[in-house]
């Protein structure tokens, strides 16, 4: 591997950038805490045991191997960490001066309650702007409130369009299937996903699809490629 003048490894060049959803590194004494994958503890409890230096060093390690960093992104771990810890991860990642701009999930987990689609829009914009101010690219996380309230296709389009219009690009969308989160069953009803992706292709540069549906993902890749997404 080549090295820079400072002695740091030069990331290899690849035709595509692969993003690694890096997890956090915990201090050894977390082993003694009563926890499991399903019940890792409250965000405040978890924060006491995060080894922040090792967590950031892991991101530098991945960057050195040519990976982009998807920060505060792995859905299950993100929501276990809570927004306060996620925000610290995002800002700390932004201070690493990585080879590639990192991406990070923008959602509404900082809000105690959501009463309307307008609350959703404001919440996502708030987090997305923090990500952008930190030097990252927002990935709009799926919004559980929409399927929980039986939102129709046009509501999805209106919510996402309002978020997209309020932000600078580039942006990405995340579509998480019900296999990973049953409460998201029926997400993006009708043709809403493709209509949203077509709203402003110059801003919406792509999507992360976690659907376990290879046929649909092939179809989506072909359709989006026509808009250089």
Predicted regions: what is each one?
Residues 3, 10-12:
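Polar/charged low-complexity regulatory segments
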Residues 3-5, 193:
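Residue-level detector of functional hotspots within protein domains
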Residues 5-6, 25:
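Charged, compositionally biased N-terminal leader segments and the immediate start
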Residues 13-188:
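Active-site beta->alpha loop and helix N-cap motifs at the rims of alpha/beta catalytic domains
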Residues 168-229:
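Catalytic alpha/beta core domains of metabolic enzymes, predominantly
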């Amino acid at each position: 591997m080549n090295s820079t003048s400072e002695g740091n490894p030069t990331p290899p060049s690849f035709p595509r950038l692969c993003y690694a959803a890096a997890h956090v590194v915990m201090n050894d004494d977390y082993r003694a805490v009563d926890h499991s994958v399903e019940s890792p503890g409250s965000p405040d409890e978890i924060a006491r045991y995060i080894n922040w230096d090792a967590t950031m060093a892991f991101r530098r390690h991945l960057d050195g191997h040519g990976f982009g960093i998807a920060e505060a992104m792995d859905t299950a771990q993100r929501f276990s960490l809570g927004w306060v810890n996620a925000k610290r991860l995002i800002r700390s990642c932004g201070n690493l001066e990585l080879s590639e701009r990192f991406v990070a999930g923008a959602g509404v987990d900082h809000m105690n309650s959501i009463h309307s689609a307008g609350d959703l829009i404001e919440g996502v914009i708030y987090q997305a702007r923090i990500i952008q101010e930190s030097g990252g690219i927002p990935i709009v996380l799926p919004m559980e409130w929409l399927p929980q309230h039986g939102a129709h296709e046009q509501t999805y389009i209106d919510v996402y369009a309002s978020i997209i219009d309020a932000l600078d690009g580039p942006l990405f969308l995340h579509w998480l299937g019900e296999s990973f989160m049953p409460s998201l069953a029926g997400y993006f009803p009708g043709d809403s996903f493709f209509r949203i992706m077509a709203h402003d292709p110059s801003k919406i540069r792509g999507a992360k699809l976690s659907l376990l549906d290879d046929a649909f993902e092939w179809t989506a890749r072909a359709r989006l490629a026509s808009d250089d997404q």
